[in-house]
């Protein structure tokens, strides 16, 4: 049980250190990340749709 509590304490200490180093993104950085994510989702969806259409044309069902 002591080993478990030590692991939890260690994890919490490391998490606290990471949270202290990180910063909230600015609006410009947020918009860029949102655009990139949106483009990626559209691209993956388009590829999936193309594969689905090809599969439909090949199998006929």
Swiss-Prot record:
MF annotations from Gene Ontology: protein transmembrane transporter activity
Membrane topology: Single-pass membrane protein
Keyword Translocase: no
InterPro entries in UniProt: Prot_translocase_SecE_dom_sf, Translocase_Sec61-g, Translocase_SecE/Sec61-g
Gene Ontology terms: biological process: intracellular protein transmembrane transport; protein secretion; protein targeting
Gene Ontology CC: one annotated term: plasma membrane
Localization annotation: Cell membrane
Annotated coiled-coil segments of the chain: none
Domain of life: Archaea
Keywords, sorted A to Z: Cell membrane, Membrane, Protein transport, Translocation, Transmembrane, Transmembrane helix, Transport
Record's function text: Essential subunit of the Sec protein translocation channel SecYEG. Clamps together the 2 halves of SecY. May contact the channel plug during translocation.
Subunit structure: Component of the Sec protein translocase complex. Heterotrimer consisting of SecY (alpha), SecG (beta) and SecE (gamma) subunits. The heterotrimers can form oligomers, although 1 heterotrimer is thought to be able to translocate proteins. Interacts with the ribosome. May interact with SecDF, and other proteins may be involved.
Family: Belongs to the SecE/SEC61-gamma family.
The protein's name: Protein translocase subunit SecE
Organism: Thermococcus kodakarensis (strain ATCC BAA-918 / JCM 12380 / KOD1) (Pyrococcus kodakaraensis (strain KOD1))
């Amino acid at each position: 049980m002591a080993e478990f509590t030590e692991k939890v304490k260690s994890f919490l200490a490391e998490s606290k250190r990471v949270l202290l180093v990180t910063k909230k993104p600015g609006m410009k950085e947020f918009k860029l990340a949102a655009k990139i994510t949106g483009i990626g989702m559209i691209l993956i969806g388009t590829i999936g749709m193309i594969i689905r259409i090809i599969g439909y044309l090949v199998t006929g069902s």
